[in-house]
From Swiss-Prot:
NCBIfam families: BADH, PRK13252.1
Site positions (Seems to be a necessary countercharge to the potassium cations): E247
Gene3D superfamilies assigned: Aldehyde Dehydrogenase, Chain A, domain 1, Aldehyde Dehydrogenase, Chain A, domain 2
Ligand binding (K(+) 1): T26, D93, V180
Signal peptide segment: none
Cofactors (names): K(+)
Coiled-coil boundaries: none
Name this protein carries in UniProt: Betaine aldehyde dehydrogenase
Residue positions where Cysteine sulfenic acid (-SOH) is found in the record: C285
Amino acid sequence: MSVYGLQRLYIGGGYVDATSGKTFDTFDPATGELLAQVQQASAADVDRAVASAQEGQREWAAMTAMQRSRILRRAVDLLRERNDELAAIETRDTGKPIGETLAVDIVTGADVIEYYAGLATAIEGLQVPLRAESFVYTRREPLGVCAGIGAWNYPIQIACWKTAPALAAGNAMVFKPSEVTPLTALKLAEIYTEAGVPAGVFNVVQGDGSVGALLTGHPDIAKVSFTGGVETGKKVMSLAGASSLKEVTMELGGKSPLIVFDDADLDRAADIAVTANFFSSGQVCTNGTRVFMHRSVKDAFTQKVLERVKRIRVGKPTDADTNFGPLVSAAQLDKVLGFIESGKAEGAKLLAGGTRLTDGHFGSGQYVAPTVFGDCRDDMKIVREEIFGPVMSILDFESEDEVIARANDTHYGLAAGVVTENLSRAHRTIHRLEAGICWINTWGESPAEMPVGGYKQSGVGRENGITTLEHYTRIKSVQVELGRYNPVF
């Protein structure tokens, strides 16, 4: 018997059964308990979801921007009213501490919907005079039906981030959450329907990567927004282009540098480094896992980091005192433990953690201790590759030019940060770092107003911020002639 029972697809404003006859299981990563059986969508189900979205989108786009804005604001109110209920589900599904999901996941998702609800009425075209009797005007029109493919680390937040600009601009979306954390996207669908979003405007299909491929290759999907790993992102982008030249937004992986200069407030720097590596058990794409510290502060900084790691409260995610939970799945645990063994084998110095936690209730969950490696080199696997777990690599440097070159020596370019009391140095360094999201003397906040996305192989396009609306509209140019038409023939 599962906790939440059988989970169906959400198409056309309500729950429907999948036609595949297949289901998959989702588990609580803290206890191993079966949470739900989830119906897997078939190709016919994807077609049905897209057709429903096309119908709903026509009704949604015909509304005024103010009408759409009011409906989205009602959805925000409902999300906030149900915050505690949704946070409890998210904690069971992801393993995140309840204090984290209560304060972050639904809250920040609702903030983004509220932000775009306010911008819905600000989508407008231009008027361009050509001469006394002729002018051009432009219209920003919705794309139509978009596909959203979510990652397992922030299920409901990612669903909100992808739907908010799409719906504000008059589009519909068919969303596929990760099969690892599939539950809360369905709750978001319920909320949109209750708020007054027309049937079909937000549909949820469940399943593995094969369902994502069906969406990506579907001829009636105009755009794909994907969050996940680099290699999968490349496949999505290739299929999107090959099928129908779809627009894409890609929020992919990272191996982000955090640079601590010799004049930094070391207490602040240590606080930032620990947050940038161990928040959400290290399962955050923007984590600052390559911590570069100036050689002159190596010992003092490392000691402060280790003091803070000892204060991390690993425990049951449902306990209010816990601030560090399990990894999301057994597969992710095995991956992280493999990286830890690689670090040991390549000569990194293990300063903290490095083991799976198995005592007591930890034995039934996917727990690994917060891990810190010192004496790391740039060529180590733990320094070069994204781990997506609680593993910090500490490296030292001597000069500004040196550390910038080393920080940029990666095919990733998602995030970067510096800690220094010298603002000139801070801005000078940030301007040279090849990353799309940067922080000075802080780390990790991604407010609705801030565009987020990567350079290089960390992504294409942006999420959040005003600029994202451009990625969910297309421009129509119209010339108007008020005077005499001069024929060519």
